[in-house]
Amino acid sequence: MKRQEFALFSLTLMLSPWRRVLLPAVLAAMAGPALAQLKAPSQASRATGIFVPQSSDVAVPSSQPQLGVPQPSSGGKRSQLVDEVVAVVNNSVITRRELLDRADEIEAQLRTANRPAPPRADLLGEVLERLIMERVQTQAAQDAGIKVTDQELDRAIESVAQQNRLSATELRRRVEASGMTWTKYRDELRKQVQVIRLREREVDSKVQVYDGEIDNYLAARGGQGAAATGPTEFNVSQILVRVPENASDAQKQELQKKAEQLLKQAQGGADFAQLAQANSQGPEAAQGGAIGFREIGRLPALFANAVVDLQPGAVAPEVVESANGFHILKLTAKRVAPASTSASSPAAASRITQTQVRHILIRTGPNMPEAEARRQLGTLRDRITHGGDFADAAKRFSQDGSAQAGGELGWVSPGELVPEFEQAMNRLRPGEISEPVVTQFGVHLIQVENRRETEMAPEKQRDFARAEIREQKLRAAYDDWVRQLRSQAYVEYRVNRQR
């Protein structure tokens, strides 16, 4: 399920507001119990919800709509608008109406969240790129022949309804009231599941974590099972021949030839740093292409695979292609980092403080501004501190998957929860209830029930490290995969990206 959480995190960057809440429910239906909503990405134990954090950049607010159903459409007001094509993506088109409707949705979210919107032209450019990326991935999944059965789709829709405390009939009524047909809703959902399946096949299945990486991770943090020294670090230098986003096939071939020529020069004994300074378009060109010492797990996956078996001073035998262009790589140096000072006391390092905690969550979004969620939870806190029952309140009001368990998250270890939640939790004594706490999931009331000191078994330490390293690699591999899909797609802009 951890892989699915990662997929959702990444896909939310390209989906319209209602789709961002719909997707977690899709995967609940596909995979059964999911990750705790508040669990940090590297954790995968309790099943208390699958709402996905909003990863925000310039355009999209960090909050989510309150319901996993479409919000009222603004498309009707454009009924007289000529539906011209603004972009061609392989064999499909994106229309001006799609672009403006999506931009309006995002602006409405920003207004609700009291966040300033970027200039309209900038917003339209960003939204158009997102629509293109969404279309590219959907087409790739369809071209790969990935199928989603009607039965799987029905389970996904049932999960959407349950998460939003609706019956299937009520969900359909909400969808149709928003202006979207039920058939369209099912089609959109099917496409997103196809994309997730493709990513699992093309990205997740190829990411591996090696025992040496786990040893290095534990050594750096002083855990049991770690080596006596610190992790091995690699100093990689690169020459980047950048390929423009809209480069033609002929341009790309010319740039590849240039990269091959630079590789031959580097392999022939030319000074790599001077070659980089003169030819690289990477951000570290002025430093001779040196990226600096990093653990292997913190290098881009393409780089790590190319240099992991090289001896210091060696140049990778082949040009490495990424979505950014062509890379010539050299392993400049390799070293063993000093061991962590805490590594000398593995017994102490393996003892951790666990917290038994429960919470009440109100998700924020267009239907629930953050200020209103704070007000409601403040009122609820007053009731509980004056004799009300926390578990009963969680069952009635919480919008997390843990609601039916009275908000219980059970015993949690350091690093298992998102930072804002964990920091607030750590300030509480057993029995205390926090003031409303804001995270990317919404607003919470947190109650600490108990604390205990416990040993973390070496096997659990290694499992934790493996999950964390895998998460880092998945993110890097996913980014590379998406850029690669984009670079291989035929994209033609038909109009200026302005209203």
Swiss-Prot record:
<dbReference type="Pfam" id="PF00639">
    <property type="entry name" value="Rotamase"/>
</dbReference>
<dbReference type="InterPro" id="IPR000297">
    <property type="entry name" value="PPIase_PpiC"/>
</dbReference>
<keyword id="KW-0574">Periplasm</keyword>
<dbReference type="InterPro" id="IPR023034">
    <property type="entry name" value="PPIase_SurA"/>
</dbReference>
<comment type="function">
    <text>Chaperone involved in the correct folding and assembly of outer membrane proteins. Recognizes specific patterns of aromatic residues and the orientation of their side chains, which are found more frequently in integral outer membrane proteins. May act in both early periplasmic and late outer membrane-associated steps of protein maturation.</text>
</comment>
<dbReference type="InterPro" id="IPR046357">
    <property type="entry name" value="PPIase_dom_sf"/>
</dbReference>
<keyword id="KW-0732">Signal</keyword>
<keyword id="KW-0697">Rotamase</keyword>
<dbReference type="GO" id="GO:0043165">
    <property type="term" value="P:Gram-negative-bacterium-type cell outer membrane assembly"/>
</dbReference>
<feature type="domain" description="PpiC 1">
    <location>
        <begin position="231"/>
        <end position="333"/>
    </location>
</feature>
<dbReference type="GO" id="GO:0030288">
    <property type="term" value="C:outer membrane-bounded periplasmic space"/>
</dbReference>
<keyword id="KW-0413">Isomerase</keyword>
<dbReference type="InterPro" id="IPR027304">
    <property type="entry name" value="Trigger_fact/SurA_dom_sf"/>
</dbReference>
<dbReference type="Pfam" id="PF09312">
    <property type="entry name" value="SurA_N"/>
</dbReference>
<feature type="domain" description="PpiC 2">
    <location>
        <begin position="352"/>
        <end position="450"/>
    </location>
</feature>
<dbReference type="Pfam" id="PF13616">
    <property type="entry name" value="Rotamase_3"/>
</dbReference>
<dbReference type="GO" id="GO:0042277">
    <property type="term" value="F:peptide binding"/>
</dbReference>
<dbReference type="GO" id="GO:0006457">
    <property type="term" value="P:protein folding"/>
</dbReference>
<keyword id="KW-0143">Chaperone</keyword>
<dbReference type="InterPro" id="IPR015391">
    <property type="entry name" value="SurA_N"/>
</dbReference>
<dbReference type="InterPro" id="IPR023058">
    <property type="entry name" value="PPIase_PpiC_CS"/>
</dbReference>
<dbReference type="GO" id="GO:0003755">
    <property type="term" value="F:peptidyl-prolyl cis-trans isomerase activity"/>
</dbReference>
<dbReference type="InterPro" id="IPR050280">
    <property type="entry name" value="OMP_Chaperone_SurA"/>
</dbReference>
<dbReference type="GO" id="GO:0050821">
    <property type="term" value="P:protein stabilization"/>
</dbReference>
<protein>
    <recommendedName>
        <fullName>Chaperone SurA</fullName>
        <ecNumber>5.2.1.8</ecNumber>
    </recommendedName>
</protein>
<dbReference type="GO" id="GO:0051082">
    <property type="term" value="F:unfolded protein binding"/>
</dbReference>
<keyword id="KW-0677">Repeat</keyword>
<feature type="signal peptide">
    <location>
        <begin position="1"/>
        <end position="36"/>
    </location>
</feature>
